[in-house]
């Protein structure tokens, strides 16, 4: 998709604050600093539209980005960041659960994992949870520029095995915000789920 118009419409912490215009939504989930904002910036072809940070845990609300007045990207707070209080983690969990389990406009979830590492327990739990709710999932292995393409199959097989990947209900792609590898394939998945 050629993106010319993007607007950060709102940040929300509850259903009462979600957009009401009925556009389809694609949520981006993953642990802190896995690259959700970088993926967003690459997809919309902007360098710093979605704020990236070297400090994990910066996103603390559901951030709705209107893309071409056709759909929303919903940037979800990262999980697994140890310096966030237990109370705050619970609040994030409740906010994410409310959104994902009740939002009719949600067409799919892009679940980001770091291509270089085994999925965390939180990554596995999120994948299982999304799968349980029959939500279309695209697993995106970020930072793929850090591994050799000749090893993609090895890393993909490992990630899928760790997640308990179900190829009948999920898709998998490698992605790099540095090289833009996988950008078009992610857009194809998004378009197919609008």
Curated annotation (Swiss-Prot):
Nucleotidyltransferase is among the record's keywords: no
Pfam families: MMR_HSR1
Cofactor(s) in the UniProt record: Mg(2+)
Binding site for GTP: 30-37, 57-61, 75-78, 142-145, 175-177
Keyword rRNA processing: no
Molecular function GO terms recorded: GTP binding; metal ion binding
Positions that bind Mg(2+): 37, 59
PROSITE patterns per the UniProt record, alphabetical: G_ENGB
Domain EngB-type G: from-to ranges: 22-194
Keywords in alphabetical order: Cell cycle, Cell division, GTP-binding, Magnesium, Metal-binding, Nucleotide-binding, Septation
GO cellular component: cytosol
GO BP term, pick one: division septum assembly
Record HAMAP family: GTPase_EngB
PANTHER family reported in the protein's UniProt record: ENGB-TYPE G DOMAIN-CONTAINING PROTEIN (PTHR11649:SF13), MSS1/TRME-RELATED GTP-BINDING PROTEIN (PTHR11649)
UniProt similarity note: Belongs to the TRAFAC class TrmE-Era-EngA-EngB-Septin-like GTPase superfamily. EngB GTPase family.
Name of this chain's protein: Probable GTP-binding protein EngB
Organism: Leuconostoc citreum (strain KM20)
């Amino acid at each position: 998709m050629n993106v010319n118009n993007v607007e950060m419409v709102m940040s929300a912490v509850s259903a009462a604050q979600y957009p009401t215009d009925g556009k389809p939504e694609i949520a981006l989930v993953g642990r802190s600093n896995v690259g959700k904002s970088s993926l967003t910036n690459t997809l919309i072809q902007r360098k710093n539209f979605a704020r990236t940070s070297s400090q994990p845990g910066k996103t603390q609300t559901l951030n709705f980005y209107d893309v071409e007045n056709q759909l929303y990207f919903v940037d979800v707070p990262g999980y697994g960041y140890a310096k966030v209080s237990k109370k705050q983690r619970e609040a994030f969990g409740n906010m994410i659960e409310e959104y994902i389990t009740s939002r009719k406009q949600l067409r799919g979830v892009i679940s980001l994992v770091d291509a270089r590492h085994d999925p965390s327990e939180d990554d596995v739990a999120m994948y299982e949870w999304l799968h349980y709710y029959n939500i279309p999932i695209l697993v995106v292995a970020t930072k793929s520029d850090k591994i050799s393409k000749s090893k993609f199959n090895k890393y993909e097989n490992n990630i899928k095995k760790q997640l308990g990947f179900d190829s009948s209900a999920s898709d998998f792609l490698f992605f790099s915000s540095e090289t833009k590898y996988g950008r078009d394939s992610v857009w194809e998945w998004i378009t197919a789920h609008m």
